[in-house]
Curated annotation (Swiss-Prot):
Belongs to the glutamate--cysteine ligase type 2 family. YbdK subfamily. Disulfide bonds: none annotated. PANTHER family: GLUTAMATE--CYSTEINE LIGASE 2-RELATED. It comes from Bradyrhizobium sp. (strain BTAi1 / ATCC BAA-1182). It is an enzyme of class 6 (ligase). This is Putative glutamate--cysteine ligase 2.
Length: 408
């Protein structure tokens, strides 16, 4: 790595970085129930054209890792970079850290003529041009997945919430299944694929579900059942460990957390924290009422599978399937918030949870991308510019319009 870049990073710490590094120094040690962390994946793109970067140097990732205090890393494809926050008990701290991480990674990328884009599909990237990261782990995955892995030019957001009792963790995962489509709708940021409008607000999962062991979790009733499943696959040589279970939600291999993996990466930091806070408050509600898992059976999971598709297709405009008939996303969200409001108050994140109503009313990143596309006369360059600005903006994009319907 160029020592001049390291020296600049040593001497050029922003006030944000100084404060965050100090505050986060013991963040991983002060772990309490319902603490949480957020992981985000971004595309690396040419700073001038915003075309996706196909090959990226190791030096960039070393510099980003240094600049963020060890919180930025490579992903499976060279076009991607991932960041992970510290463990947090305060949504406001998580928001500030995400803003810091995005700015630091964007600043480092700028030293290499690149920038970052927080969206789950790059509007103009062609998956055939993707290049895997040259690491043994990724080489083994590509050998197994072949074209499906190459097509995985996708970025997501993962949210971990600590739930210390392992058995209750599985009850929460089961009870959470009907709610997963709501998180998909709120976070949708992938309406374009290979320079085409897909007609879906959240195309990412349509491509991601080509991979094995994806989709909604199975209806396991206990940790021993899940362990039997994992053991069968590992003993048969299907996967090296349970980190290769890529469901929309899964128990973490390394931490006492339940990981939500369904959301697209939110272009707005405030949206990301809102979605994470909604998940955190809902996880607390379900953890304290483990009997709610008993109400989720085959019918409920089958309905959730349909609603997952509808959330991908329509985003915040979705009419969800319910046994009593169709229900709007706003109605579903209102019911959720009514149930979890005491938990959001206990976690001091009610304001962040309430923001989800704004997203549902005015739209997610997908709606803003589609608006930029329509207003520019169908120019994907306008979409890319909107994403670039909104990714590292210090202020929230204006919420002034109704959601935009994808092309039929």
């Amino acid at each position: 790595m160029d020592p001049r870049i390291l020296e600049r990073l040593r001497l050029g710490l922003s006030d944000d970085e100084r404060r965050l590094v100090i505050r986060s120094a013991t963040g991983g040690e002060d772990v309490t129930e319902y603490s949480f962390g957020i992981e985000e994946e971004y595309f690396l793109a040419d700073a001038r054209t915003l075309d996706v970067a196909i090959r990226t140097p190791d030096d960039l990732f070393e510099a980003a890792n240094w600049s963020t205090g060890g919180q930025a890393m490579r992903e499976m494809l060279q076009a991607q970079i991932e960041v992970a926050t510290n463990v947090h008990v305060d949504s406001r701290d998580a928001r500030e850290e995400l803003k810091f991480l995005r700015r630091e990674v964007a600043s480092v990328a700028g030293q290499y003529g690149l920038t970052i884009l927080a969206c789950s599909t790059h509007p103009t990237a062609m998956w055939r041009s993707s290049q895997p990261t040259p690491r043994p782990r990724y080489a083994e995955m590509m050998e197994d997945l072949r074209i499906v892995g190459q097509r995985n030019m996708l970025c997501g957001m993962h949210v971990h919430v600590q739930l210390p009792d392992s058995e209750r963790r599985f009850a929460v995962m089961r009870a959470m299944i009907p709610y997963i489509p709501v998180f998909i709708a709120l976070s949708a940021s992938s309406p374009f694929w290979n320079s085409r409008e897909t007609g879906l607000k959240g195309y990412r999962l349509a491509a991601y579900d080509e991979l094995p062991r994806t989709g909604l979790p199975e209806l396991f009733t206990s940790k021993p059942e899940y362990d039997r499943y994992v053991a069968a696959l590992t003993r048969s040589g299907v996967m090296p460990d349970e980190s290769h279970v890529w469901w929309a939600m899964r128990p973490s291999l390394r931490h006492p957390t339940l990981e939500l993996r369904a959301p697209d990466v939110c272009t707005s930091v405030d949206d990301a924290v809102a979605v994470a806070s909604l998940y955190r408050a809902l996880a607390r509600h379900l953890y304290l009422h483990p009997d709610l898992a008993d109400a989720v059976g085959n019918v409920e999971r089958a309905i959730a599978v349909e609603n997952k598709w509808r959330a991908q297709r329509y985003g915040t405009d979705c009419l969800f399937v319910a046994e009593e008939g169709p229900v709007t996303g706003q109605e579903i969200l209102n019911r959720m918030i009514a149930d979890i409001a005491p938990h959001a108050e206990a976690l001091d994140c009610l304001a962040e949870v309430e923001r989800c109503r704004t997203i549902m009313q005015f739209g997610s990143s997908a709606d803003y991308q589609l608006q930029a596309y329509r207003e520019s006369g169908g120019e994907l360059s306008a979409v890319l510019r909107w994403i670039e600005v909104a990714t590292v903006s210090r202020s929230d994009p204006p919420r002034t319009h109704a959601p935009v319907e994808p092309a039929q």
